Amino acid sequence: MMSKDQALIAVDAMGGDGGPRVVIAALALALSTDPDLRFRVYGDEALVRAQMDLFPELAPACTICPAPDVISGEEKPSLALRRARKSSMGMAISAVKTGEADAALSAGNTGALMAIAKLYLRMMRGIDRPALTTILPTLGKNGVVMLDLGANTECDMRNLVQFAVMGAVYAQSAMGIPRPRLSLLNIGTEEMKGTEDLRAAAALLRQTEQTAFQYTGFIESDRIGQGDADVIVTDGFSGNIALKTIEGTARFITNLLRRAFSSSLRSKLGFLLSKPAFRLFRVYLDPNNHNGAIFLGLNGIVVKSHGNANVSGIAQAVHLTAKLVRSNLVNCIADDLDMFFSQASNKELQA
């Protein structure tokens, strides 16, 4: 019998660039700091068992579940749906549907993962579409929850408001913020700026009586990392561009500093003196330290890891998944949605 602190995670061992070699090592690392974790590991039995043999401490916490098929990184979602039933990704998500696991984790194909998760778990009552959500680092101590990061290229006013409610609950669960500050991403902070849907969503959020979050208005993209907001809501097109720009800028600055500090003997000496500070800088910008995105709006928890995440990165995603399970995320979102839609002015927003 599982204790209330245990979290049973269905893991797609075949997803990501490193496959079982990286995934199994990550499970061992996560278990070393959280002994209440339990895993159902889906994948090629021989490959998974070979890696498990390297970490005997995993044996009591893991169940190997053979999966004859693998969804590749280039596979179209339509084809992935047809092969989902026997794939490691599909079987992991199915375990959440049947109650064999509390959540699913995969580093595989994002489009396929979303399509299979929507098919198996369905949308929550009151939600039209899922939103790909993650926590980005900021100058503030908590970071910022940002959604949608690419699941929906076009979003109307209703989608944005639904994302706001879900994002606020996620910030409460993942970051422990009782009443997060929430903003809508826009090209300016003035009320007349932005699309009609953005302005309509802003107007509704301003007038809504609720306690889940405090709406603080529009925010521009240059303020994402400043810690001005705890939750930033946008459509998936703008969100994905913003995310890729942030990641690319971080790599650019890191490479620029590396080039600058290797340009001369004096600069190399300067780097040696500054090494502790730059080590902190690298840790802060390393995406492995912030790994893990979730499709909010589904009747279950499905977490997506970066495909190129290393062992510590996937372990970070495991810890995030466990935290969301223990915080009862799905039920908390459902409760807040019911409260939000119970207001007469918001009933037309319900899916």
Curated annotation (Swiss-Prot):
GO terms for biological process: fatty acid biosynthetic process; phospholipid biosynthetic process. It catalyses: a fatty acyl-[ACP] + phosphate = an acyl phosphate + holo-[ACP]. Belongs to the PlsX family. It holds the Pfam family FA_synthesis. Gene3D superfamilies: Isopropylmalate Dehydrogenase. Keywords: Cytoplasm, Lipid biosynthesis, Lipid metabolism, Phospholipid biosynthesis, Phospholipid metabolism, Transferase. HAMAP family: PlsX (MF_00019). Catalyzes the reversible formation of acyl-phosphate (acyl-PO(4)) from acyl-[acyl-carrier-protein] (acyl-ACP). This enzyme utilizes acyl-ACP as fatty acyl donor, but not acyl-CoA. This is Phosphate acyltransferase. The lineage of its organism: Bacteria, Pseudomonadati, Pseudomonadota, Alphaproteobacteria, Sphingomonadales. It comes from the Bacteria. GO terms for cellular component: cytoplasm. Its EC number is 2.3.1.274. InterPro entries: FA_synthesis, Phospholipid_synth_PlsX-like. It is found in: Cytoplasm. Homodimer. Probably interacts with PlsY. Pathway: Lipid metabolism; phospholipid metabolism.
